[in-house]
């Protein structure tokens, strides 16, 4: 009983207090993602080669040739797809937090400044969303994309922004 009360108190008082104390970091993480998204959308809208560079030619050509989103491929295997999406988002969140401490890049044998990988992760994920948004807008598939993203993204994206804020704070 006491444990449940402590958990309830944390979510009622503790968590909101932490968010208020760290709001600038969370807002910065959110802004970095949005800036990445805006850059991705703008440059993809202007030049298809940018979109292909970020998303890969196979992905872009597949969506263009089928005139369908990859979301139709999860029909019938929703539990597996849901698990895969959840694992991906947990991994992104953990990397966003851990990336705030330091990042080792073996290909160049250096340790980057603290937070560098968190910055990269937030901007690049925004960039990918922006590029995909431009692609589906060009093909009149935007409704299908956002109908897929909004139900789970309304929880997942803020979680990633909180994790990114934590990474920037570290």
What is the predicted role of each segment?
Residues 15-35:
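Alpha-helical transmembrane segments and their helix-start/interface "positive-inside/aromatic belt" motifs
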Residues 41-66:
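Interfacial/capping segments of alpha-helical transmembrane domains
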